[in-house]
A protein has these predicted regions:
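Short helix-loop capping/hinge segments that flank enzyme active sites or metal/cofactor-binding pockets
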Residues: 65-88, 242-251, 303-361, 373, ...
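Short glycine/serine-rich loop segments
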Residues: 97-224, 410-423, 429-432
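A short helix-breaking turn/cap at a secondary-structure junction
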Residues: 186-272, 456-472
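Gly/Ser-rich catalytic/binding loops embedded in alpha/beta enzyme cores
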Residues: 2-169, 273, 278
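Residue-level signal for inorganic ion chemistry
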Residues: 30, 52, 217, 248, ...
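Acyltransferase
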Residues: 23-27, 57, 260-287, 310-321, ...
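Gly/Ser-rich, acidic/histidine-flanked active-site/gating loops
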Residues: 5, 79-82, 206, 229-303, ...
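Glycine-rich, small-residue loops and helix-cap segments
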Residues: 19, 67, 161, 340-472
Length: 472
């Protein structure tokens, strides 16, 4: 174990400013961590070690994170580094410019060491692809950590880095943190700096760091949020809990697609009791979205996005999509299936998703916060399904069932977080609690997260396959 393993990014930055070690020395420590843990857990796609070494001692010590190394999810443009999205089709893709969000990350004083594993183009619920392989859960390597920020979550949970970047378009900053025992935040839509090459904001996807501590996440949030005031004024740096007591709506199951595992339900009920002991008011309430209708609408939405990808892959290969060899069988067959969806049905799907905004706005006229499972299951077995399978209605339902509590939140534009407050006795895997607030109420969630972190600390609860127990 290296002596810095228990430090979060904020603590490391303080020690860098105190000159206990140099930025270059810290880079070498983190590189050794990667070299020890990645062969066992497979969380990396690309390394940027030489880039990080060259930048190390050029980062100002008065920058908030002062040169602390991090990893970025392999689904965002970083100038000069490969961006593969976990796909053969993207292996030669090297963006020339960093997007605005990445520029803010580096201005905050982070030093990028490399990129983390994802399912191909975030198209499946298990972090696995046919280029880099499957990412294993450090709590139980026979299991996955969901997706798509799986590599980043594993790197943090294994103690390799105190923070790693994630994107969340359907649950990706909540599902992997739930299964790895770390903190994951999905900010409100358009809250953060743009992560898109055109400078716009995706309708569903947003960016934020995954972390062991709330204070790391809150500081990173303040340094990468949009300062434009459109559509929300900046939140700023949130440093602790609020005295405000909240009215919380509790959901443990919705009766659709798949029943919530008893361990997951019981975990949320115990967290509800914790909230009541802290003075919050909790009552059970129905989940406001029909999971079957959501699954249908999301499939239609996906169908409206993939036509250009099909054209590009066929042009690059000179072959029909299924024969191109550039996409996994799962994604290619999913795209082919989606091609049959009519423009009228795509429009109907988008209308359903757009209507989630008023649906959740109505819910938050009654409640300050919703508490729900992150997923109805603890975690999927590592190879329960693989990228070489053909898309089917069964697989579509499998994915939709595991996204049913997270994906509607992206289209509603609400902030949400996974907080590590429970563990599975059967599997030894963490079970996150999913807190959701009204659009723009990111501060409220951070204040609640600080309170929960104080009431039930998780920072020093380590995975068995982590650097806490592995010599470096």
């Amino acid at each position: 174990m290296d002596e810095l393993i228990d430090e979060d990014a904020t603590g490391l930055a303080e020690r860098l400013r105190a000159r206990e070690f140099t930025q270059a020395e810290l880079v070498e420590t983190f590189i050794r961590r990667i070299e020890v843990m990645n062969p066992a857990l497979n969380f990396m796609t690309n390394s940027a070690f030489d880039r990080a070494r060259s930048k190390a001692d050029t980062i100002p010590l008065d920058a908030p994170f002062a040169g602390v190394p991090i990893l970025m999810k392999d689904m965002i443009d970083i100038g000069g580094l490969p961006r593969t999205d976990g796909s053969r089709f993207m292996l030669k893709n090297v963006p020339e410019r960093s997007v605005e969000y990445v520029e803010a990350v580096e201005a905050a004083g982070f030093n990028i060491l490399g990129q983390t594993n994802v399912p191909e183009m975030a198209s499946f619920i298990i972090t696995n692809n046919d280029v880099f392989g499957a990412t294993k859960n450090p709590w139980n390597p026979d299991y996955s950590v969901f997706s798509s920020s799986g590599g980043s979550a594993v790197a943090v949970a294994a103690g390799v880095v105190p923070m790693a970047h994630g994107t969340d378009g359907a649950g990706s900053n909540r599902l992997p943190p739930s299964a790895t025992g770390i903190f994951g935040m999905k900010p409100s839509r358009r809250r953060m700096r743009s992560g898109e090459a055109d400078g716009r904001h995706d309708v569903a996807k947003t960016n934020q760091m995954l972390s062991r501590t709330v204070r790391d996440s809150a500081l990173a949030f303040s340094l990468t949020e949009s300062l434009s005031g459109d559509p929300f004024p900046p939140v700023g740096h949130i440093t602790g809990p609020s005295d405000r007591r909240l009215k919380v709506g509790l959901i443990v199951d919705d009766g659709k697609l798949i029943a919530t595992d008893p361990e997951v339900s019981e975990a949320q009920r115990k967290v509800a009791l914790l909230l009541e002991n802290l003075g919050h008011e909790v009552e059970e309430t129905p989940w406001p979205v029909d999971a079957n209708e959501m699954a249908d609408a999301y499939a239609k939405f996906f169908g409206g996005k993939v036509g250009a990808l099909k054209t590009a892959v066929e042009a690059a290969s000179g072959k029909p999509l299924m024969e191109s060899g550039l996409l996994t069988r799962f994604l290619a067959s999913n795209i082919e299936s989606s091609a049959a969806i009519s423009p009228e049905d795509i429009a109907k799907g988008r209308t359903f998703l757009d209507e989630l905004v008023p649906v959740f706005a109505d819910v938050f006229r009654k409640y300050d916060v919703l508490l729900a499972p992150v997923a109805p299951v603890v975690a999927p077995p590592l190879y329960e399904h693989t990228p070489d399978e053909l898309f089917s209605d069964e697989l579509s339902q499998y994915v939709a069932a595991r996204l049913k509590f997270t994906s509607p939140i992206n289209f509603a534009g609400c902030p949400a977080m996974s907080v590590p407050l429970s563990w599975s006795a059967d599997l030894g895997i963490p079970i996150g609690s999913h807190f959701i607030a009204a659009e723009g109420q990111d501060r409220l969630l951070y204040e609640l997260a600080y309170e929960l972190e104080e009431a039930r600390p998780w920072r020093n609860i380590w995975a068995p396959f982590s650097l806490k127990y592995v010599p470096v």
